[in-house]
Amino acid sequence: MPRYKLTIEYDGTPYAGWQIQADQQTVQGALAQAFKRFCGEDVHVAGAGRTDAGVHATGQVAHVDLSRHWRSDTVRDAMTAQLRPHPIAVLSAEEVPDSFDARFSATKRHYLYRIINRRPDLALDRDRAWRIPQKLDAQAMHEAAQRLLGKHDFSTFRAAECQAASPLKTLDQLDVSRSGDEIRVITSARSFLHHQVRSMVGSLMRVGEGRWSADDLEAALKAADRTRCGPMAPAAGLYLAAVSY
């Protein structure tokens, strides 16, 4: 059966996450239904990242096995038509070897977190960013973030329901930058614990508002204790930006 790699963009606001759940609207479920309408097949759409409810993607990657060969642009365009009116877009489709697995072949996942640092409410980015009214020091956040790079026990930044076998992860990138009112947090690793990115962002917010120092952040990491984490950032600001292979 030919295998296709899909690069997908979506607004996660109306979905209960990526993974199919009974009686709930999910991104994976919407894609499977669209394939059913396109080619009449019941397929499993395997994603690189199982994003939570309300989390977005600009570069999610998935693979799917179909019973016959289709031109890649036909798959892309047919899915575009069948997905309407869902806020999901298949940006590209390409045939790949059977050995390709969207989840297990990935060498790095890249996430973006958007903070809008202003007092007025968000009109256009209400469900696409975290509004923080108090002034944040993005440079202090960036400098503190470097303390989290490398291989560590990230239990402090791990959800209680996380099913990962080990809390050990290697964080390759965690950059914080400001452009006007927007603060962007960009992070990369082979894989992340459940809620790790949102937990790190919430803790960095404590640094930005001056309540924590870089030493405080590092101490929270080394404690390997969930109760030492800052507030978890809301899902609305998080994007799965890209996946490397």
From Swiss-Prot:
GO terms for biological process: tRNA pseudouridine synthesis. The active site is at D52. It catalyses: uridine(38/39/40) in tRNA = pseudouridine(38/39/40) in tRNA. InterPro entries: PsdUridine_synth_cat_dom_sf, PsdUridine_synth_TruA, PsdUridine_synth_TruA_a/b_dom, PsdUridine_synth_TruA_C, TruA/RsuA/RluB/E/F_N. Substrate binds at Y111. Pfam families: PseudoU_synth_1 (PF01416). Keywords: Isomerase, tRNA processing. Coiled coil: none annotated. GO terms for molecular function: RNA binding; tRNA pseudouridine(38-40) synthase activity. Gene3D superfamilies: Pseudouridine synthase I, catalytic domain, C-terminal subdomain, Pseudouridine synthase I, catalytic domain, N-terminal subdomain. Formation of pseudouridine at positions 38, 39 and 40 in the anticodon stem and loop of transfer RNAs. HAMAP family: TruA. Belongs to the tRNA pseudouridine synthase TruA family. This is tRNA pseudouridine synthase A. It comes from Xanthobacter autotrophicus (strain ATCC BAA-1158 / Py2). The gene is truA.
